[in-house]
């Protein structure tokens, strides 16, 4: 059984480090109880395993369990959820959810009817489930262990309003010393391909449903060809630049199942104005999580 996670710790710009956020790090297994007065709830008792930590997402008081040696989400997941739109009534699926960062951020932003994360690596899926429990969201978010290539067998056809994916960017296993290492699986198409993601998305989206993906610009021609092949019409695209004088290193894409041909190219998104200092637009994206703007 094969597939890949979407949340990852890639060698690229990431969100502020754990030292810059409210972080609880434990070297050994323990039990954590966090009381959040703002949300007037007591979090579930959640066990942390060796090397795991709890990071504050600064979104509705939500937190996430991560292991910096294996699974940490990056800027790509944050920007994808800032780019994506959903409605409260929507049912959402995140393909290759990793430790569950995208369902958590989308729930914080839109309070969707229900969200599901599909993840093949059990260790990541287990962290995602414990993060869901930590935030007392078991009634809103499900984490399913499974293969992206078998997603159309796991879920009913045309059952999701919105599908998100932060897939592996690199083709094949070139240069990998250990293709089974979690970070390698996250970055390279070891267990699933772009076509696997797009073809399963086409089967699982409702007619008129929206697909949101973050990827690398060097594969843009292939991405567009693949989307059109499976009748997912590209509708919106935004290139992401680390600095204003650098080449883009990410592309955000929205496609609609059965949509009419016409695509909007949004203005470029610049991440940093100087080393360690984000552009105002990046902070605006962060504010979206407490000020939802539902899709029409």
PLM feature spans:
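Conserved small/polar residues in nucleotide/adenosyl-binding loops
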Residues: 289-296
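Periodic low-complexity repeat segments enriched in small/acidic residues
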Residues: 1, 6-38
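Class I SAM-dependent transferase core
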Residues: 45-87
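Conserved SAM/SAH cofactor-binding pocket of Class I
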Residues: 83-165, 170-176
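Short loop/edge segments at beta-strand edges and connector loops
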Residues: 66, 145-146, 215, 238
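Mobile active-site "lid"/loop adjacent to the S-adenosyl-L-methionine
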Residues: 167-196
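Class I S-adenosyl-L-methionine
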Residues: 233-277
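Conserved Class I SAM-dependent methyltransferase catalytic core
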Residues: 191-241, 248
